[in-house]
Every structure is written in C-alpha cells, then in structure tokens.
C-alpha cells in the first residue's frame, strides 16, 4: 500500500524513480544539537519532510500547503511530492 506505482505511471515512466520527490524520513538520527523536530509545531520528531533548510511534519506541511505554495518559515516553495526513505512497519509484500 503506497509502495507500488499504478500501472499507468509505470508504463509512462518505467521503473525509474520519478523526479522531484522529497524524502520523508521515519526515524532521523540525533543531530549535533539534539533531536530533529518540526520547525512549525516543535513537537513532531517522526515522519519529517525536508523543506529547504529545516524539517516539517506532515500535519504542518498540509496546513502550510492549504494557505500558500511557499513556506512561511523560509519563504521557499513547499515540497509537493514525497518519497519514503524506509518502508513503513508493515508485513512484507507477498503476491
């Protein structure tokens, strides 16, 4: 669920990764100055999405995207496409 592309996308682009995808990390390593947190709410530290020089949680990213196409913190365009770095904790896919 969410790990496979639809048949139309695979036929159009093949098996290569689509360009413009921003990685979503489920577990970030601890940084030099402590844990990485969402720059908007400062609570979320899992499922962060990289904006230009900071991280946003999915809730804050959705809220910011509903207001504008640009980040209210750094002023750069907000990410629109997400790529998962690690697969979510679910049973392995068996066809």
Swiss-Prot record:
Residues where lipid is bound covalently (N-myristoyl glycine): 2
Processing after translation: Myristoylation is required for the role of RING finger protein Z in assembly and budding.
The keyword Transcription regulation is assigned to this record: no
Membrane topology summary: Lipid-anchor
Motif (PTAP/PSAP motif): 88-91
Cellular component terms (Gene Ontology): host cell perinuclear region of cytoplasm; host cell plasma membrane; membrane; virion component
GO biological process, one term: viral budding via host ESCRT complex
Zinc finger (RING-type): 38-74
InterPro entries per record: RING_finger_Z_arenaviridae, Z_RING-type_Znf_sf, Z_RING_Znf
Gene Ontology molecular function terms on file: RNA binding; zinc ion binding
Subcellular location: Virion; Host cytoplasm, Host perinuclear region; Host cell membrane
Description of how the protein assembles with itself and partners: Interacts with protein NP; this interaction probably directs the encapsidated genome to budding sites. Interacts (via RING domain) with polymerase L; this interaction inhibits viral transcription and replication, Z partially blocks the product exit tunnel for the releasing nascent RNA product. Interacts with the glycoprotein complex; this interaction plays a role in virion budding. Interacts with host eIF4E; this interaction results in eIF4E reduced affinity for its substrate, the 5'-m7 G cap structure.
Protein family according to the UniProt entry: Belongs to the arenaviridae Z protein family.
Function text: Plays a crucial role in virion assembly and budding. Expressed late in the virus life cycle, it acts as an inhibitor of viral transcription and RNA synthesis by interacting with the viral polymerase L. Presumably recruits the NP encapsidated genome to cellular membranes at budding sites via direct interaction with NP. Plays critical roles in the final steps of viral release by interacting with host TSG101, a member of the vacuolar protein-sorting pathway and using other cellular host proteins involved in vesicle formation pathway.
Domain remarks in the Swiss-Prot or TrEMBL record: Late-budding domains (L domains) are short sequence motifs essential for viral particle budding. They recruit proteins of the host ESCRT machinery (Endosomal Sorting Complex Required for Transport) or ESCRT-associated proteins.
Name under which the protein is recorded: RING finger protein Z
Source organism (scientific name): Pirital mammarenavirus (isolate Rat/Venezuela/VAV-488/1995) (PIRV)
Lineage: Viruses, Riboviria, Orthornavirae, Negarnaviricota, Polyploviricotina
Originating gene: Z
């Amino acid at each position: 669920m969410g790990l496979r592309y639809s048949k139309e996308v695979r036929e159009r682009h093949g098996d290569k990764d689509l360009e413009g995808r921003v990685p979503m990390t489920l577990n970030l390593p601890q940084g030099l100055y402590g844990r990485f947190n969402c720059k908007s709410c400062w609570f979320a530290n899992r499922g962060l999405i990289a904006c230009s020089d900071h991280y946003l949680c999915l809730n804050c990213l959705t809220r910011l995207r509903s207001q504008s196409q640009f980040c209210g913190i750094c002023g750069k365009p907000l990410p629109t496409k997400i790529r998962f770095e690690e697969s979510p904790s679910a049973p392995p896919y068996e066809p």
